[in-house]
């Protein structure tokens, strides 16, 4: 039964025309937006041809959005921060798209795509759209088609695009070339993270925020802020 259902969904996606995808995205049909993103992620030659045609039609649309990249080491609380930030934005009548990039296993090729489960409130918000995607081996903290996915979300009317990176640290600089503002979340007690900082991701961040800076971690967070200020000569 499941196999037949998946086959039907696949056939249905293949039957959609370029106009179907374009109209669906422009009307902010979330199901068609999700299918369009899946289309551009596909490596199938036929899908790629359709995806290119869809993107060419959507690129001519006026795009008036703010793109914000959010990075940080694993465990820093990116997803929790994004949910709180996203809810604040939607409360101000912004439409927020979250592109959450998850790492892909080098052994199995699989990805958990679990970021959305940590944004349960935001995922139910009618003014928010969350799309988890695997890196599929792409370096730089983003996926192979992150730029194209941003274009689709902008065409759908989302005026704030939040790009959450994989969270592997200093190598995630590609996202900085795709966004208007680049935020690096750091943990209290910077320690070894200051090593090699001049060539690292913190050097190109527009803002550094020390997260989890409450309770017993407040003093450590204050020390971390001072260390970053001295290291970066702010």
Q: At which residue positions do the language-model features occur?
A:
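C-terminal accessory "lid"/substrate-recognition subdomains
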Residues: 6-13, 216-234
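Hydrophobic anchor at the beta1->P-loop junction of P-loop NTPases
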Residues: 68-70
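P-loop (Walker A) phosphate-binding loop of NTP-binding proteins
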Residues: 73
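Conserved beta-strand/loop subsegment of P-loop NTPase cores
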Residues: 182-186, 204-214, 227-234
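Hydrophobic positions on the alpha1 helix immediately C-terminal to the Walker A/P-loop
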Residues: 81
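Long, basic/Gly/Ser/Thr-rich N-terminal segments
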Residues: 2-25
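Nucleotide-state-sensitive switch-loop elements of NTP-binding domains
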Residues: 19-28, 34-66, 76, 85-171, ...
